[in-house]
Amino acid sequence: MRLLLDTCIIAYMALEPDRLSQDVLSLIEDYDNQLCVSMESVKELIVAYRRKGIGRKISKKEEDTTQMIKDGLCIQIWPIREEHIRTYARLTINEAQGHNDPSDHIIIAHAITEHIPLVSSDHKFDFYMKQGLDYICNS
């Protein structure tokens, strides 16, 4: 099974694996599963690096972030394509819960377009299931 991992899951894998639920950990450790991440998540980690946040703990240099994800965590990085942006443009945003993070919206659109489950700890993602998101909650 292919799984799209949200940015927080990448951070937990690299820094705080104890924050991964047993169910999510089992999915990640199953060698039959293909782990993927959106280029948008890579961008978020680089932004975090520049802000001296978690990114600095994940890689020594900003430019090493992609290599760490691919080689260190064995995760494929998927580019954002035009069809992902079209899904993003059609996405109804969860304004009731104040979900205004455009990076989350791109990642959600990526998962919907590719028809793959998105693994995240963000409970606001439930809202997008009625729009086609297959969501696996890390709780």
Segments predicted by a language model, with ranges:
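Short, flexible helix/strand-to-coil boundary loops that buttress conserved ligand/catalytic motifs
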Residues: 14, 24, 49, 92, ...
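Short, well-structured N-terminal submotif of metal-dependent ribonuclease cores
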Residues: 1-38, 53-66, 139
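Alpha-helix capping/helix-boundary segments
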Residues: 9, 41, 84, 107, ...
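Short loop/helix-cap segments at secondary-structure boundaries that form the rim of catalytic
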Residues: 125-131
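Active-site neighborhoods of divalent-metal-dependent phosphate/nucleic-acid chemistry enzymes
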Residues: 74-121
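Histidine- and aromatic-rich ligand-binding microenvironments
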Residues: 5-6, 38, 100-101, 122-123, ...
